[in-house]
């Protein structure tokens, strides 16, 4: 798969065939507000008071030399090569024939499109509401949701995973705290929405678990009394919206992520995750965190909007004693220009 991530000399960039999104750290000597000039092949292409800039209308498979300067001098120089134009696998066309009517369950058709997607191809969603259950992604692929496209998870629970919770709507990688990445180079982008069942899905899972754990809860009334509320223990198996386990080089851009049954974007034992120009919504969802790096490194989020039922960003390194035993700390997290 053509490289979409570049980082050197204080500059980092993620690119498509026609765009480059560039970001950098604010200089230590900078004031509250500074103006930065971005140059492409020695010609100024724009200024910004933010520490990121997007270049558009570029040519595919073309090398560009980028330079950022401010009143204190140069920030750095970075050479970026845009990707090839990707062949689109339209989920509504043959052989998938997914139906975006908000009613038809498309899980099998969409999973086939995911499985078929090769390097330098893209699973493409035109406008429509595509109902689906859990989907599993693999290395070296891209999802693109066009404006008006909604990948909508059902309000029914999905099968469980080794995380001892139900599957997320989108599942990337396989959890293994003893290993490095097993899933890499995935792009989720576009102008559409990835959404799940939110409060309804959460409540259905909690009630199902409450019935399943009836005897345990009765026998451990003292433990239950110390919890936040009566839903705490049965609510532990709620799925995420997007789960990234042992992933590397994942880029999420431009999308709206909405209504996970608990956390929305959760990356575990992962590295080099970039999220930008996204909207993350889970208003009214208990524990509805927005963006949670967990025992992960080099994760960056910027230019994003949050309206969440809990933390916008929550940085974690495991849970309870297990986090200390596994001992994989979260490092090098950058959060800027979000609100």
Q: Which positions does each model-derived feature cover?
A:
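Extracellular/periplasmic carbohydrate-active domains that bind, remodel
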Residues: 1-339
């Amino acid at each position: 798969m053509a490289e979409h991530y570049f980082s050197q000399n204080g500059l980092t960039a993620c690119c498509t065939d026609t765009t480059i999104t560039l970001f950098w750290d604010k200089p230590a000597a900078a004031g509250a507000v500074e103006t930065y000039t971005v140059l492409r092949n020695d010609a100024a292409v724009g200024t910004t008071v933010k520490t990121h800039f997007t270049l558009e209308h570029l040519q595919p498979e073309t090398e560009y030399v980028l330079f950022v300067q401010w009143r204190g001098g140069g920030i750095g120089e970075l050479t970026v090569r845009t990707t090839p134009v990707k062949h689109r696998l339209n989920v509504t066309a043959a052989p998938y024939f997914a139906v975006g009517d908000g009613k038809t369950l498309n899980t099998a058709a969409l999973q086939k499109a995911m499985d078929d997607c090769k390097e330098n191809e893209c699973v493409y969603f035109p406008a429509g509401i595509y109902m689906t259950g859990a989907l599993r992604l693999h290395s070296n692929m891209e999802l693109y949701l066009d404006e008006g496209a909604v990948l909508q998870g059902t309000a029914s629970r999905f099968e469980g995973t080794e995380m001892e919770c139900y599957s997320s709507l989108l599942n990337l990688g396989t959890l293994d705290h003893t290993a490095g990445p097993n899933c890499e180079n995935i792009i989720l982008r576009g102008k559409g929405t990835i959404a799940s069942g939110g409060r309804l899905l959460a409540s259905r899972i909690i009630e199902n678990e409450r019935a399943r754990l009836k005897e345990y809860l009765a026998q451990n009334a003292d433990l239950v009394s110390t919890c936040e509320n009566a839903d705490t223990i049965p609510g532990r198996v709620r799925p995420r919206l997007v789960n990234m386990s042992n992933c590397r080089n994942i880029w999420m851009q431009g999308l709206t992520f909405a209504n996970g049954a608990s956390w929305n974007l959760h990356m575990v034992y992962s590295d080099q995750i970039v999220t930008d120009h996204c909207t993350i919504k889970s208003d009214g969802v208990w524990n509805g965190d927005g963006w949670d790096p967990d025992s992960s490194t080099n994760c960056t989020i910027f230019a994003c909007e949050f309206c969440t039922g809990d933390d916008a960003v929550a940085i974690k390194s495991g849970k309870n004693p297990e986090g200390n035993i596994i001992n994989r700390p979260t490092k090098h997290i950058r959060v800027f220009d979000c609100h």
